[in-house]
Regions:
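Active-site-adjacent structural elements in enzyme catalytic cores
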Residues: 1-336
């Protein structure tokens, strides 16, 4: 199968999606692997292409809240308010759905489903032209760093999917926040941190927002992507390091003969020497979050023994950054 890159033409990829093909598309978070969410055979292809476990539910991408409502059984009393403030955007909402309205391949066999309206005009136009909602897990081989440009998708999935809609680089760089609204009588709970932070939601709604940190058991079906399976890991081992320990870590590991790649902010890298050094765009957590997956992919293409990545405080957007970094590093951190 030839994988075609589309830059302006949306009619062709929309037709491919209508006919049950798999097409990757851009969003503000990461690139998604698109298929008709109402076509279970198309959805099965997404799992096969990614090598994704079948009990890991998929997010349904819609062009409007009205489109999502066709499948939702019960609306949380805060749903409309949240949607008006944060959609389109990097926020996924989980609702109880009308039984049988979506294939169980989409829901992981649960009575709930996750919906998002991406803040990407190209993708909203694609959904509109396809005429159906689209599933859209990250368009990469399962377990690897998520793709933030079309080249990342092509690297992982060329020859396996019909096409890629190229919308340039993703602006956020990590997957959406997932907020559970499935119980109308319960307070909203974050199941996966992202760019819409716990603090943003709490400030807007005037209530405490909980963050679900429990580890999903092997026998349990996760309610949201990102809760159960190993994610975001390059082939080269990754180790976290606190910024103040970076220089010592480099010296110690180089003394052991390790070939190192470093991923950190420009100031953190001043004066350090390693086989390959990659800096985020600036010192902000936004830059670190945007550059994390792309940096891991770039360093993984080199002949390195270890990738060192600096940590940040787990507040605001730092929660999303550290959530992905901890998984990429399998929780390993350099100890002084």
């Amino acid at each position: 199968m030839d994988t075609i890159i589309y830059k302006q033409d949306l009619a062709t990829p929309a037709q491919l999606l209508k006919s049950g093909q798999v097409v990757a598309f851009p969003t503000e978070t990461v690139y998604g692997l698109g298929a008709n969410a109402l076509d279970k055979e198309a959805v099965k292809q997404v799992f096969a292409v990614k090598g994704r476990p079948s009990d890991n539910p998929l997010i349904v991408h819609v062009e409007s809240f009205e489109q999502a409502k066709k499948y939702i059984q019960t609306l949380h009393p805060l749903a409309e308010k949240i949607v008006q403030q944060f959609w389109p955007g990097p926020l996924t909402l989980i609702f109880e759905i009308i039984p049988g309205s979506l294939p169980q391949e989409v829901t992981g066999g649960l009575t709930t489903a996750a919906f998002r309206m991406p803040n990407a005009k190209l993708t909203l136009d694609l959904i509109h032209q396809a005429g159906v909602p689209l599933v859209g897990p990250s368009a990469n081989t399962s377990g690897k760093p998520s793709p933030t440009c079309a080249a990342h998708v092509y690297h992982d999935l060329q020859g396996k999917i019909a096409g890629i809609v190229d919308g340039g680089n993703c602006q956020v760089g990590v997957e959406s926040t997932v907020l559970d609204l499935s119980n109308p009588k319960a307070a909203p709970m974050i199941l996966r941190p992202g760019a819409i932070t716990r603090e943003m939601l709490a400030d807007f709604l005037g209530i405490e927002i909980l963050l679900d940190k429990h580890l999903v058991k092997e026998s349990e079906t996760p309610k949201s992507p990102g809760m159960k399976y190993k994610h975001y890991s390059p082939n080269t081992p990754v180790m976290m390091v606190q910024p103040e320990n970076l220089a010592k870590a480099v010296a110690d590991l180089k003394a052991q003969g390790k070939k190192l790649g470093l991923l950190a902010s420009p100031k953190q890298l001043v004066g350090l020497n390693a086989e390959l050094v990659l800096a985020y765009e600036d010192e902000s957590v936004e830059a670190a979050t945007k550059g994390l997956f792309a940096g891991l992919r770039a360093l993984d293409e080199q002949d390195l023994d270890l990738i060192l990545v600096t940590t940040t405080a787990e507040t605001g957007l730092g929660q999303a950054y550290m959530n992905r970094l901890k998984k990429a590093a399998a929780q390993k951190i350099y100890e002084v």
